[in-house]
Curated annotation (Swiss-Prot):
It comes from Enterococcus faecalis (strain ATCC 700802 / V583). Its main location: cytoplasm. GO terms for biological process: response to stress. It is found in: Cytoplasm. Pfam families: SprT-like. Zn(2+) binds at residues 67, 71. GO terms for cellular component: cytoplasm. InterPro entries: SprT-like_domain, Uncharacterised_SprT-like. Residues 7-145 form the SprT-like domain. Keywords: Cytoplasm, Metal-binding, Zinc. This is Protein SprT-like.
Amino acid sequence: MTDQALQTLVEKISIVFFQKPFLHQATFNRRLKTTGGRYHLASHHLDFNPTVFLKYGQEELEKVIKHELCHYHLHLAGKGYQHKDKDFKELLAKTGGARYAPPLVERKKAVFHQYQCQSCGEVILRKRRIDTTRYVCGKCHGRLSWQAKKEQI
């Protein structure tokens, strides 16, 4: 999808769902990493993350567009346009926009180091490696031995 196609889609959604025209500029912004879109308060322009369209398709992009248009129209009307405001929540629910952007970056799985006490057999999981010559078991003060790296979700 090009910026021009995005502009026409935003204008169409604005007329159909909000019954008001979108008079500013809507573009894709590849620098957005974790958000689906952004509304600029000063210029009233909208930026959208192209990853939403590429990863989830046009249906999810339309939900993000509705979300940003809620900010846009409420701000221009002088009403509460922030996420916490009642006006915003009501308009978002009425138009069917997304409350949150879908996950755009995959989270790294946590890796833990597994240690075991040589005396009592207590298993200890740590995110950071520890020096087994300096640290001992907290339960019985026995020596620790490194077992393996474990991935946890």
